[in-house]
Amino acid sequence: MSDSTTHYDLIVIGGGPIGLSTAWQAARRGGRRVLVLERYGFMNERGGTSGAERHWRLQYTERDIFALTLEALPMWRELESLTGRKLLHEVGSLWFGDTEVKTNEGQISGTARAMDALDVPYEWLTAREIERRYGFTGLPAHYEGFLQRDGGAIDVRGTVGAVFQLSQQHGAVLRGNERVLAVDPDPDGVTVRTEERTYRSDKVVLTNGAHANELVEAWGSKLDVGLYELPLVTLRQRRAEPGRPFWFAFQQPTEEDTNLFYGFPPNPWSTSDDIRLGPVFEVDALAHADDAKGVPAPRPVERVTDWATAHMPWTDPRPAELSTCLAMLPGNPARQFFLGDAGALVDGGENVVVSVAGWGFKFTPLWGKICADLALDGTTAYDIGRHALVPSESSGIVA
């Protein structure tokens, strides 16, 4: 294969939602050769994109990240308009529980203050009001929270299909089932070696999620992350009532786990009345993404069904279906994501952009634009300083 056919302006490694969004945002500028390399087939559910839905929310405790969700919203509307498919479904975002507990999702009281500061409307609710309105039972009397009506659910498969479609329409080359073995940056560009061939590119964007450290560690660095295989528990409803929102229960951790649970109502784009629940337990971390089994451990499932039995009388707590989702979370929860160039990690790293880890699906179109901006322009207008890749001088670990 000649050099002219193996050289690209931009190579994106990882063909999930952020990678495909990056390819779309870069290719739509025109005049650039863009390649996406995906180790599995496109639209697979082996990593962090499994399942049908993700939580859409405006609110964040951290105001710099909150500002980014407000920037992301019109980009979602553009994505919907370009593909003719509704992707954000505003069923509401209900947070309730211990208002002071700090979690990887945020803190209720701090988030309410952030909504006040940014003029985002919400309705404050007591435990009894939440029970009367939405049918929960047995909530501790001191639980409180809020309903933010603009939140809800994202159609995962619809979103991945949308950015896949747009990246192709704008001329990006998409190659599935091609595993990347090495990314070697230098001051003039980047060499990318796969199991099949070697490429040369001016810039590279890493959006390969749980497999990112396989490439970063070759630079003598490492991203401090935890990999968790989290259960997805589908339940049937004894009585289906419209109007229930997405919910997240903020609770004090136990000796066993973080004690955090969430639930989706029936998906508006589905014909099923089933609901999906899950825990957010950062326990039993995996050593490697390939250690994921695709089948949840019994104890976390039991914790979910026990919570449903205690507080959700409209559901049948016997699981109708079980699956898992692979979550890659920063070891330092304050950073939330890894997003920025790798200039501090390796010689020539300014030619590599990294976007991995965290609960980032809600940022799909914005993260794609930021990655394209950083790769093609060397800068972005958005405040992403919190997420920068700055290694420890002693260990090389990016915490």
Go through the PLM ranges and name each one.
Residues A27-G48:
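Glycine-rich FAD pyrophosphate-binding loop
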Residues T309-A399:
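C-terminal catalytic lobe of FAD-dependent flavoproteins
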Residues I11-I13, Y199-H211, G368:
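Short hydrophobic core segments
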Residues E53-R133, L260-F261:
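Dinucleotide-binding Rossmann-like beta1-alpha1 core, especially the glycine-rich loop
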Residues E100-H170, R175-G176, A182-D188:
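Flavin (FAD/FMN) cofactor-binding and adjacent substrate-gating region
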